[in-house]
Amino acid sequence: MPLHKVPVGLWKRLRLREGIYSRLPAHYLRSLEEARTPTPVHFRPHGAKFKINPKNGQRERVEDVPIPVHYPPESQLGLWGGEGWLKGHRYVNNDKFSKRVKKVWKPQLFQRELYSEILDTRFTVTVTMRTLDLIDEAYGFDFYILKTPKEDLCSKFGMDLKRGMLLRLARQDPQLHPDDPERRAAIYDKYKAFVIPEAEAEWVGLTLDEAVEKQRLLEEKDPVPLFKVYVEELVEQLQQQALSEPAVVQKRANRT
C-alpha cells in the first residue's frame, strides 16, 4: 500500500491548483509547467539510443545521464552560461592506489563590463568564457538575454534583465535616447521580434514566492469608492452629450 495518496513528485504541481496559486496569471502558470531540459554543458550527449561498439561491432544501448551540477548563490548574481560546481572525488597524487578525497571543480570567472542597448546601461558582471562565446554567437548582449531560456540562463540577475528589457520594449519607453528619436526607433525596430504584452512582461523571471506576493498585493488594492465611479461616469456622459449636440452660434446685432 502506498504511503501517500498522491506521489511526492506531483505535490508541487498540485499545489498550483489551490489557493492563491490557482489565481496566478495563466501565462505564468504555463511557464512553470512547460519547463524544458537545459542544454548539456558539462557532458556530451550521445544523441541516439544505440551505438556500435568499435571493439566488437555489436550494437549497445546508451543513455544520456546528466552530471549533477550545484549552482551556488553567487551564480544568481552573474551570468555563468549554465556552468556550475561539479562535486566528485580524486586520488591523492593521481595514484589510484592512494586515498580518495573529495574535490569540487569550479568554473573560471571573469569580471566584464557589458552594455545593453535596450536599457542604455553598462553592467559589471561576473561571467565565464562560455558566456562570452554565447554572447558572440547571439550577436550581442541583448540578443543573448532575450533569446536564452530560463533553464539555460540559470541566473536571477539574467531573468531580471530580461524582464526589464521586455517591459521597455512593450512600453516603447520614450526615455531611451530622448534627444535622438531616430536611434530610439532603430533600437525598438531591431528587437521588435521579442515584444510581448506588458501584462505578461511584468511576470517574466519572477520566482514563485515573488509571483505570489505580487498577486497578493494586486488583490489587496484599496477598493475605489462608488461615488468616484459614478462621478467619472457622469462626467463622461456629459462630455458625450455636449459633443453630440449641435453648437448654437448667436449673431451679434450690427451697430449703425
UniProtKB/Swiss-Prot annotation:
Keyword Protein biosynthesis: no
Annotated gene: MRPL28
PANTHER family: 39S RIBOSOMAL PROTEIN L28, MITOCHONDRIAL (PTHR13528), LARGE RIBOSOMAL SUBUNIT PROTEIN BL28M (PTHR13528:SF2)
MF-aspect GO terms: structural constituent of ribosome
Segment annotated as transit peptide: 1-55
GTP-binding as UniProt keyword: no
Subunit structure comment from the entry: Component of the mitochondrial ribosome large subunit (39S) which comprises a 16S rRNA and about 50 distinct proteins. Interacts with OXA1L.
Tree of life domain: Eukaryota
Cellular component terms per the entry's GO annotation: mitochondrial inner membrane; mitochondrial large ribosomal subunit; mitochondrial ribosome
Compartments where located: Mitochondrion
Keywords for the protein's UniProt record, in alphabetical order: Mitochondrion, Ribonucleoprotein, Ribosomal protein, Transit peptide
UniProt family annotation: Belongs to the bacterial ribosomal protein bL28 family.
Entry protein name: Large ribosomal subunit protein bL28m
Primary residence: mitochondrion
